[in-house]
Amino acid sequence: MTELLARLAESGAEYYRRGWMLATAGNLSVRDPEDASRYFVTASGGHKGRLRAERDFLRFELGMQNPVPQGVKSSAETIVHDLIYARFPDVGSIHHVHSPKVTLVSRLIGGGNLWELKDFEYIKALGFWGEGDVVRVPVVVNHHHIPSLGDAVERAARLDARVPAVLVDGHGVYAWGDSIDAAQRHIEDLEFLADMTWEERFRPR
């Protein structure tokens, strides 16, 4: 498990370098491959560019049943990860980042709407390979009551289980995959697609 957490820390460092997880924002998690009911998620307040496997991740059972060690604060958004892992057994890793263009596009599209992507070659990185495929990524309202946010993200994720992401209005994106690498690929792809969406639909002329 230490090796997987070290790999997840590498994702955090890469996101920080790109400016996608600044000011301790965001959270990352990975499911335990030895026990599908267990996952590890970043603790609250940690610098995402300097994560360490032995220090910055908390173990949880589905349902958030296990206690948090004294002196360590869990991320309030752990509940979002918990609900996604419970709903989708094939999900192996979840990444929540505040990448700039995705966050901007989430505001421009607005909560309760769908971000429609078509005719972009890059939707293949999200698993859509068919000619004429259309990807509809849900955008949910940013509830400050985190359990409500978790419910909103989980409900939106069920709209089309093929779509490995949900945007939160003004609050970045949750993306997932069957592995850390897959989740990171989806994060990177969505930021590229958001940049293209900005240029094509929203950039002032």
Q: Residue ranges of each PLM-predicted region?
A:
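Glycine-rich flexible loops
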Residues: M1-R205
